[in-house]
Amino acid sequence: MEKIIEKSIYASRWLMFPVYVGLSFGFILLTLKFFQQIIFIIPDILAMSESGLVLAVLSLIDIALVGGLLVMVMFSGYENFISKMDIQDNEKRLGWMGTMDVNSIKNKVASSIVAISSVHLLRLFMEAERILDNKIMLCVIIRLTFVLSAFGMAYIDKMSKKKDNLH
């Protein structure tokens, strides 16, 4: 009976597969949004102010950061929780694949969130004259919370690795 339960629990990891497929659809939508932004920028590029162009490029950077985060979560999550990817050509295999454990994924996600929030905050500062001060303050506090959380998670990870090395 115990073996059946263990096999069932182990097989249930495949329930995550549709989640990763869904993330790949999300990545497709994000890619479409990226090109929509570019198509939106091109006709107005000569009339666009410098700050308008910077804001448009920040939007593209934001989409790229979220896309990179999605790829990292899809690949590393699939390899950590479902199955190793059988990529025959080692030259095409991404260098970090198979090397990220759950803690390193969490740290990368936290770092990505900090980077994404930085882009949003920079965009907010560039439009500061049209935004209420309390909204800017709230965004700064939220970003600081992200930064402190990322540092905290990295510190905990470092301490747990140090503890593991002592044993």
UniProtKB/Swiss-Prot annotation:
PANTHER family: UPF0114 PROTEIN YQHA. The keyword Repressor does not apply. Coiled coil: none annotated. Its main location: membrane. Belongs to the UPF0114 family. InterPro entries: UPF0114, UPF0114_bac. One of its GO terms (cellular component) is plasma membrane. The chain crosses the membrane at residues 15-35, 53-73, 136-156. NCBIfam families: HI0507. Pfam families: UPF0114. The keyword Transmembrane applies. It is a multi-pass membrane protein. This is UPF0114 protein in repA1-repA2 intergenic region. It is found in: Cell membrane. It comes from Buchnera aphidicola subsp. Schizaphis graminum (strain Sg).
